Amino acid sequence: MLQRGLWPWRTRLLPTPGTWRPARPWPLPPPPQVLRVKLCGNVKYYQSHHYSTVVPPDEITVIYRHGLPLVTLTLPSRKERCQFVVKPMLSTVGSFLQDLQNEDKGIKTAAIFTADGNMISASTLMDILLMNDFKLVINKIAYDVQCPKREKPSNEHTAEMEHMKSLVHRLFTILHLEESQKKREHHLLEKIDHLKEQLQPLEQVKAGIEAHSEAKTSGLLWAGLALLSIQGGALAWLTWWVYSWDIMEPVTYFITFANSMVFFAYFIVTRQDYTYSAVKSRQFLQFFHKKSKQQHFDVQQYNKLKEDLAKAKESLKQARHSLCLQMQVEELNEKN
């Protein structure tokens, strides 16, 4: 016969006669234990304490994929992670920062500094920048960017890359030379037209000032001729009608010597020979600058515009000459 003990699922046999012993109580089962786990830190990002593959939300990473670097960062306005593909040999620091601002309009200021705090110019190639660690400052918040180490290329690889760059540059120049020269010619024509528009009002004012200065200079020359005529007439009148030649001869000598002293003093002051053309030009310039100040005519600006116009015309002449030579070479090649 079977008996039920403390555990109804277990069976016991009755003791045989002669072997009966007082029954021992079965040991009680241990009390159940409960495992309690307490989470520490921010529950939203608790996995980051256990898995090293999760990237903090504000970290900027640089990885290489298919030979091109990918810069991953968090946009400040949308709080989204965004990847930027960088072309090391074509992109510059300025173009990369411009791409950041175009992607997120909330980026007001952006700059890149070296690890020791020196600012990197906008014309620096990204290939040079990604050789070392740097700091990216967005809206006055600095982020440390660690670039993966790249293997140093061998001398043969460097020489091949330089040769390839030179070959690509020459090929691009040959294919786009005519187009670039036409663009340059168009740009020079626009520059010449713009300079002429700026010079037109100045030319009108200058023409009026020149006419006024020329009139005053001519009047001064005629006044000098009149004074010399009066001097000659007075000496003749004193010689033949008032005094004799013996008395007037020393007077005319001293007058001639005084004129020589005046001419020598003019040379000392101006460092120029006393010639009528030099005196006229000097007097004309004096009248011209005096009248220019009265009419607020900027002589330096006018001279600068004239120099720029002359340089632009010379550059246009050279561009057209080179384009003409290229067309002649193409015609000869077609004939051959």
From Swiss-Prot:
- One Pfam family for this entry, by name? MCU
Membrane-topology descriptor: Multi-pass membrane protein
Cellular compartments annotated: Mitochondrion inner membrane
- Membrane-spanning segments: 220-240, 250-270
Q: Which GO terms describe its molecular function?
A: calcium channel inhibitor activity
Q: Which intervals of the chain form a coiled coil?
A: 179-210, 297-323
**GO BP:** calcium import into the mitochondrion; mitochondrial calcium ion homeostasis; mitochondrial calcium ion transmembrane transport; negative regulation of calcium import into the mitochondrion; positive regulation of skeletal muscle satellite cell differentiation; regulation of macrophage activation; skeletal muscle tissue regeneration
User: Which positions form the organelle transit peptide?
Assistant: 1-35
**Which cysteines in this chain are paired by disulphide bridges?**
none
Q: Which InterPro entries is this protein grouped with?
A: MCU_C, MCU_fam
- GO cellular component terms, A-Z: calcium channel complex; cytosol; membrane; mitochondrial inner membrane; mitochondrion; uniplex complex
Q: Which UniProt keywords apply?
A: Calcium, Calcium transport, Coiled coil, Ion transport, Membrane, Mitochondrion, Mitochondrion inner membrane, Transit peptide, Transmembrane, Transmembrane helix, Transport
**Functional summary from the UniProt entry:** Negative regulator of the mitochondrial calcium uniporter (MCU), a channel that mediates calcium uptake into the mitochondrial matrix. MCUB is required to limit mitochondrial calcium overload during stress. Acts as a dominant-negative regulator that displaces MCU from the functional uniplex complex and thereby decreases the association of calcium sensors MICU1 and MICU2, preventing channel gating. Mitochondrial calcium homeostasis plays key roles in mitochondrial metabolism.
Q: Which family does it belong to?
A: Belongs to the MCU (TC 1.A.77) family.
Its subunit composition reads: Homooligomer. Associates with the uniplex complex, composed of MCU, MICU1, MICU2 and EMRE/SMDT1, inhibiting its activity.
- Full protein name: Calcium uniporter regulatory subunit MCUb, mitochondrial
The organism is Homo sapiens (Human)
